[in-house]
Regions:
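Juxtamembrane boundary at the C-terminal end of a transmembrane helix
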Residues: 138-148
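Loop-to-transmembrane boundary segments
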Residues: 39-50, 118-137
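N-terminal signal-anchor/start-transfer transmembrane helix
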Residues: 2-31
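Short alpha-helical packing/oligomerization segments
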Residues: 2-8, 12, 70-111
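Long, highly hydrophobic alpha-helical transmembrane signal-anchor segments
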Residues: 38-84
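Membrane-interface interhelical loops and short amphipathic "cap" helices
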Residues: 1-3, 32-35, 65-77, 111-116, ...
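Membrane-interfacial, low-structure loops and terminal tails that flank and connect transmembrane helices
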Residues: 28-41, 107-122
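Membrane-helix interface motif
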Residues: 22-27, 56-73, 102-109, 147-148
Length: 148
């Protein structure tokens, strides 16, 4: 039963969990002058929305197939499988465009600093760009290996 709702639960768990953790972690960072409260709210709300939209999209596609009981969209029947892959590629292209062409690496690195349990010195825009590039390469490779 939980697999039927995996995508929506994942979106809320990751999105709201990160929002709560980031809000808690932000206090000392605000006191140090590294962030303002409006910045924190904007970054965390953006992360919440950017987590919920893909998860909600996959969940809605999953719900259109009456017999789809699991979240593994590479195993879904067509047309749900093709729609999910199309959405995945769209979200990847959106992320890549934002990070590489629209200077999204800086706000993303600031958001990751709020929600990650890592020293802020390890998170910077260059490393975010590298991570996104690696993620995209491995994501595309996994689609190819699984027989997109």
């Amino acid at each position: 039963m939980y697999f039927k709702y995996f995508w929506i639960l994942c979106g809320f768990w990751v999105g709201l969990g990160a929002f709560a953790y980031g809000s808690f972690k932000a206090g000392p960072l605000i006191k140090q002058g590294l962030y303002t409260r409006p910045e924190v709210n904007r970054y965390l709300a953006g992360f919440l929305i950017c987590t919920l939209i893909p998860c909600l999209s996959f969940w809605l596609v999953q719900q259109t197939g009456s017999d789809i009981e699991h979240p593994f969209f590479m195993e879904w029947p067509d047309p749900q499988r093709s729609i999910a892959i199309g959405l995945l590629v769209f979200f990847w292209l959106s992320l890549a465009t934002w990070v590489f062409a629209l200077k999204g690496a800086t706000p993303l690195s600031k958001t990751i600093t709020l929600i990650a349990n890592a020293p802020a010195s390890l998170i910077n825009p260059s490393r975010v760009k590298a991570f996104v590039a690696i993620m995209l390469v491995f994501g595309v490779a996994s689609l190819v290996v699984q027989g997109m």
